[in-house]
Amino acid sequence: MKKEHRKVYEVRWYRDLSSLHHRLFLYIGGIKMIISILLLIVGFVLLIKGADIFVDGASSTALNLKVSKMVIGLTIVAFGTSAPEFAVSIKALLSGSSDIVLGNVVGSNILNILLILGISSLFSSMVVKDNTVKKEIPLTILFSVLLTILSFDNIFDKNITNVITRTDGIVTLLFFIVFIYYLASIAKNNNEENEEAPYKIGKSLLFVLIGLVGIVAGSNLVVDNASAIAKALNVSEKMISLTIVAFGTSLPELVTSVQAARKHENDIAIGNIIGSNIFNIGIVIGLPCALIGNINVGTFNYIDMFTMIGAAILLFLLTFKKRKLDKGEGLIMLLIFIVYYGYVIIGG
């Protein structure tokens, strides 16, 4: 009898211990989930407020320097918001995952035009200036075509492996230098409105820096904690990479362009996207490739490249006649993006 009682006691003790362990696990998991949700909210607050300060600082900087806001959008804003793509590319190349670099840039460029400009135009109708339609948007098309030609060497010779070589990287850098020269030439034009800058140049640049730090920190918090929440809810790694991670590097461009559109800073909103796309190809691809080494194209799909070119051409066609992007054009871009992304998720 004593042995039987002892066995029953041991079984009950084991069950109680297992139950306690399970409840403790759920409790800790619940706390982690709450912390992740709170940090996710903090991330979004930092993103939105950071973008707000960033746009104000960029606009004031343009007025202080007596240059057009488009130039500031194409340079300070675009290069600042493209920092995540650049960081991802450098890390990928140094770790030997060079095939990630191309996907990062192409995916970001497609998302920038179709999704970000699409969403931004829903918030406010964006007037596009003649110079942007005739010069800056065609430059985006040119850089997209250039990357496609340099990526697919076997178009011309079936025996060649698709690789973006160091020479290709130097070529894209040279094209980017020409782009910078073009920006320098148009930067001489004074701002058309003759507005007074709301802040002095020092404070304006400080706002740009503070805003950018807020955007980058907010982006990291959103991506990290959204991923943690998704994993806790048993969302697959593939779905996380196709959604949260893929959109993560473009969050700075998204919040900056949306905030700029809401403030009717159209040149900053559009310049940010055009400048980011050119920067992604000229610097994010060109510089690491020229300095570190080749980028393997691997089995990268032609459809993705042609979608990138098509998105740039679509932007030109939508703005050529009316010289603006409104809700109608925005919905067209969003619809095309949904179709393309559906293809990507299904596995194309």
Locate the predicted segments by residue.
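Polybasic, lysine-rich low-complexity intrinsically disordered segments
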Residues: K2-K3, K7, L17
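Hydrophobic alpha-helical segments, chiefly the membrane-spanning helices
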Residues: E4, R12, H22-G348
